[in-house]
Design a protein with these regions (language model features):
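Post-HExxH zinc-binding segment in Zn-dependent metallohydrolases
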Residues: 5-45, 122
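C-terminal, non-catalytic "cap/extension" segments appended to globular domains
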Residues: 9, 17-20, 24, 50, ...
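ATPase nucleotide-binding head domains, primarily ABC-like/P-loop NTPase cores
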Residues: 1-2
Length: 180
């Protein structure tokens, strides 16, 4: 019986694993020879994007704990200021635009505290799971892996795949794609 996961990042990872197979389940095959390379670039870019809102989520909650009596207006100002700081540090060098507030668009950070980083970690976990699942019996492995229950994240992924939880496989795959 499937029995819990270490945290919501692992739930997101499993959702990503199944989403990857949605067209396949409908009998639609993508024969594009560049598909694997494009998938890797897409995963890296998606993680880069969600990391920004994840950092903002964490920063906003740190700010709220430091300012427990803040008004809604002060929170709004802080969210906008923090989003600009994160944008300017991590995104402006890539996009060439400063003081963008697009990272502040996610209302999740208030309604579902500290959830957004689960997406970024979920993508790292998914990448490791996909590498492991490649060429194996999907149903049996998913059943085996997700029966482990609520272990610490690194113990869980190590028992699932034999490797520590790390972004290294993603970076290695990206380097390979960029070389080609």
């Amino acid at each position: 019986m499937l029995n819990g996961v270490p945290n919501t990042a692992f739930t997101e990872a499993l959702a990503f694993v199944f989403q990857k197979r949605d067209l396949e389940l409908l009998g639609i095959k993508d024969e594009n020879p560049e598909k694997e390379k494009m998938d890797i670039l897409d995963k890296i870019w998606s993680m880069y994007e969600i990391c920004g809102v994840s950092m903002l989520d964490i920063s906003v909650w740190k700010w709220m704990y430091a300012h427990p009596n803040a008004t809604a207006g002060e929170l709004q100002e802080a969210v906008i200021r923090l989003s600009k700081e994160i944008w300017n540090k991590y995104y402006a060098p890539v996009f060439g635009v400063k003081d963008e507030t697009v990272l502040a668009i996610y209302s999740h950070m208030i309604g579902y505290p500290l959830y957004l980083s689960a997406y970024a970690f979920g993508q790292i976990i998914e990448f490791q799971l996909e590498n492991y699942l490649n060429g194996k019996d999907f149903a049996n492995e998913v059943s085996r892996i997700f029966k482990q229950g609520r272990l610490t994240p690194n113990v869980w992924i190590k028992q699932a795949t034999g490797n520590d939880l790390t972004v290294d496989p993603m970076l290695e795959a990206l380097r390979k794609v960029l070389k080609d």
